[in-house]
Amino acid sequence: MKTRIKTKLALAATLLSFNVFAAGDLHLDHANTDISDTASLQNGAKLFMNYCSGCHAIGFMRYNRIAQDLNLSDSLVAEHLMFAGEKPGETITTAMPKEGAAKWFGGTPPDLSLVARAKGTDWIYTYLRGFYEDDSKVFGVNNKVLENASMPDVLWSLKEGKSEAEFDQDVRDITNFLDYVGEPAKLIRTSLGVWVLLFLGVLFILTYLLKKEYWKDVKYGIWRPRD
């Protein structure tokens, strides 16, 4: 019960952490993520930890859960995802102090555990690619999705030496990873769902044939009510 309450509160906090935008006036690019693409999730995890985790936590996720779900060895997790002596069973937090965040950004950067469930993958994908130069802002950039965002364009260095398509794929991988973080069980649920539907399909056929067999006797008078 407490876990459900915490999840709902975190989801509400994520929603309130972002400014409201007019969806009708904004075109969101399709992320086209695939949570079954393990290579994409692995790259997304690496990029998130290198470019995003300095400010944003994903407190509902643990390092060893990522290792288990994404088929990563403990050594790879330690090398690419853990930078401050964290333990595998710890949740993924940020080292940024709240006081510093409030001073530098005007508020504490939100935990992104549930951002994909709150905003959707298309929103994340478009937002991360939506920064443009604006000299009137503190960080020299603005964002077409979230106007007056207090976040700098942290992925600008990721563009260096890459084509637009390659950069878009990196952003897609980060988005894919955040989609996984929002609901890790989706990895099992989506694959299991296919088998459940197949089972229900076979069960429907067998039930229909059984119904025909029973009602055949009724139809041809083998079963008749007594007078």
Specify the residue positions occupied by each region the protein language model found:
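Short, aromatic-rich amphipathic segments at membrane interfaces
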Residues: 160-196
